[in-house]
């Protein structure tokens, strides 16, 4: 849902730049965020209830993108995603983005690329520029020992990046039951779906 939320707020920001008055009537607590001038106090005023109220109002907006993204967020309908290799599949991602646009979705708001690589745990390595504070265990004699030295599981994971790269797109691209104009773009949908297998992007030779 994070991608939908990010794109929803992005669309609101764009519309706010065009006509601030439309948001001043019903989204007062979000105004500082839409113009990029919020304070900590204003941030703390936001909660799920406030955002839910505003998003419900946006779901009735005359703007089709704001309207649709708000409904997707409220109804918990996230964009679907598939893993890919950035080095190998960058061209394929561009091609699939064009197919999403071809069937009528604005790719700015209905596609995304996200990398979630991270280190679950790493021990202190002063020779590396990117190191983390290690976890140490206090032993009975008062000495400290680094966590990976007493845990085989942590030792196996230490220093290993976990995560993947994902391409996000509307679920309608691969689920015929969700489409309004399946016949009109049948070949485009089929071409897109042919590049998705087992949750990953694939090249078709």
Where do the model's predicted regions map?
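Histidine-centered, transition-metal-coordinating active-site segments
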Residues: 1-205
